[in-house]
Amino acid sequence: MYRKSALELRNSVVSGESSATAIAEYFYNRIETEDSRIGAFLSLCKERAYEKAAIVDAKRERGEPLGKLAGVPIGIKDNIHVTGLRTTCASKMLENYIAPFDATVIKRIEAEDGIILGKLNMDEFAMGSTTQYSAFHPTKNPWDLSCVPGGSSGGSAAAVSARFCPMALGSDTGGSIRQPAAFCGVVGFKPSYGAVSRYGLVAFGSSLDQIGPLTTVVEDVALAMDVFAGKDKNDATTQEFFTGSFQDALSLEVPSLIGVPMGFLEGLRDDIKENFFASLNVLERQGSHIVDIDLDILHHAVSVYYIVASAEAATNLARFDGIRYGYRSLEAHSMEDVYTLSRVQGFGKEVMRRILLGNYVLSAERQSVYYKKGTAIRAKIIQAFQKAYEKCEVIAMPVCSCPAFADGEILDPISLYLQDIYTVAMNLAYLPAIAVPSGFSKEGLPLGLQIIGQQGRDQQVCQVGYSFQEHSGIKNICPEGCNKLFDGEVK
């Protein structure tokens, strides 16, 4: 059963081959047997899941129509609210915070009969690229337990990779879905800004954040987006970008022109570069032509991103003060102590580093030097993409400059920030992007191909990713030994 996609599991429930309850039991058995060595989940909600599964099974018994996600087990990144469950953001600051409402994506999942299994680990407040910045425990890469799974949605990627669930929700502020997807050999999709409601997502960078799915195959991304996408009265940034379904769009022809910023591929390892150009050959064999495009301005994207993201983070995290909710220091003896000690003790070092950076670039003395210049260059990055799309329909890039690296191998914060070089620009420019498995490094670790589209052209991005998946032969890949995680096959 672990090899089945979300769509296949849904169809098995509709046909009566499996029940939603049996599927939930099967995946909980996998989690309880093996997650102690991977650390993907922070908490489980078995009672809620079994209650929902029983409702789905009863609907089927009565002959009622079932939702698009009927019986599909889904993991949720722990910065997305689910009523009655803890939303910790993997931080001591919110260790005991219980969500008082459902995020819009959660409402849409449950309206379509999806089964929520639990909350997934992440870098604290989604700030990090390794999932080692969780306040509770690190997450390991199922392909090599000595390696990081990426971040900040590392728990989501690891859970899907280990087949603890066929689908998980993550959030992507600068690559936090796509990079861990590539590291863990799964599919990760960052929708266009405004395509999916952010209501109920704990904000990191409000002009950058986007909720998206991680899955084993591209078909499940399309399934998820047919549920998640659409305007929401609780999120004024949402738009109705799409008319037809994502699943129908997968069958369309690949675009004739695919842009590649050749000047932005410097510094890639030989095996990464070889894999990338081999991936382009797969697309060329389907009739696409590769054209060189000028995106040299993206060499400034990481700097701009960390100015903008840190400024927005400092503003968004100002609410966590030890007064209204969250951790409050027991050592405080004055109001100033409450503010200071609660934040120093409640936040981890990386979160405090970014708050300090954000307040620095927003300070009266530095705002014009850093923040205003950063936002001006962001506008130029958007213009550069618009000009590039005059020559092509979609853009192809690697997801990362390296495969998953060993835990502790990269400790310098600047070196970690530079891991985002191929992902942050899409958030700055509001663009959709998908990461699909493209092969393996010389160490045998997964690599990913990234396809980027114009804002609102999410369906085309998924279609190219699907076409690559089907013609490359790299589909639904599993870590060695994944089939040994749980021997039973529940019907």
Curated annotation (Swiss-Prot):
Its EC number is 6.3.5.7. GO terms for molecular function: ATP binding; glutaminyl-tRNA synthase (glutamine-hydrolyzing) activity. InterPro entries: Amidase, Amidase_CS, Amidase_dom, AS_sf, GatA. Keywords: ATP-binding, Ligase, Nucleotide-binding, Protein biosynthesis. Gene3D superfamilies: Amidase signature (AS) domain. One of its GO terms (cellular component) is glutamyl-tRNA(Gln) amidotransferase complex. It catalyses: L-glutamyl-tRNA(Gln) + L-glutamine + ATP + H2O = L-glutaminyl-tRNA(Gln) + L-glutamate + ADP + phosphate + H(+). It is an enzyme of class 6 (ligase). One of its GO terms (biological process) is translation. The active site is at K77 (charge relay system), S152 (charge relay system), S176 (acyl-ester intermediate). The keyword Methyltransferase does not apply. NCBIfam families: gatA. Heterotrimer of A, B and C subunits. Belongs to the amidase family. GatA subfamily. Allows the formation of correctly charged Gln-tRNA(Gln) through the transamidation of misacylated Glu-tRNA(Gln) in organisms which lack glutaminyl-tRNA synthetase. The reaction takes place in the presence of glutamine and ATP through an activated gamma-phospho-Glu-tRNA(Gln). This is Glutamyl-tRNA(Gln) amidotransferase subunit A. It comes from Chlamydia felis (strain Fe/C-56) (Chlamydophila felis).
